[in-house]
Amino acid sequence: IGMSKEDYYHLSYEITMHFAKAIGPKRDFVFIYVSGAGTSETSRQFWSQTKSKTERDLRELPFKAAYGFRPAGMKPYKGQKRLQGWGKYHWLFTWIPGFSNTIEEVAKAMISCAKCGYFRRTVDVRDIDTLSKWCK
């Protein structure tokens, strides 16, 4: 990803945890952290281990709830002019269920978690789809 492990750890873990502690964890706050698909403590990839540790440690803080969102592919939004990376292959997303969401679905799912809660603390692509239609 173009940075040292130390820099990545500082950016992804330390800054997030400092922010979470600085806002003063409160029992009525919901913290939503976007980690991404493939996040795992047992992964060989440093980014994945770091994101997983961040999710775990956020859950230990005294928030009402802390969710780790793990989106994967992002479908382009209507009218999007420039597609980079996997966005160029957005037509594949319709054929691979559980692989992608729209940015609108992710936003609605986050609002649903904050307003109504969710039984899973790790929210994957399919959960995002469900949550985006769930709590109004």
Language-model-detected regions and their locations in the chain:
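A short helix->loop->beta-strand "cap" motif at the edges of active sites that frequently abuts
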Residues: K26-F29, F63-K64
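Residue-level signal for alpha-helix termini/capping positions
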Residues: G24-P25, K115
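A short, flexible beta-alpha/helix-coil linker loop
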Residues: I1-G2, A37-E41
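Internal, well-ordered alpha-helical scaffold/interface segments
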Residues: M17-K21, F29-I32, S52, R56
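Oxidoreductase cofactor-interface core, primarily capturing Rossmann-like NAD(P)-dependent enzymes
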Residues: E41-K136
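SDR active-site strand-loop-helix element
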Residues: F31-A37, F69-P71
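NAD(P)H-binding glycine-rich loop region in Rossmannoid oxidoreductase-like domains
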Residues: I1-H18, A22
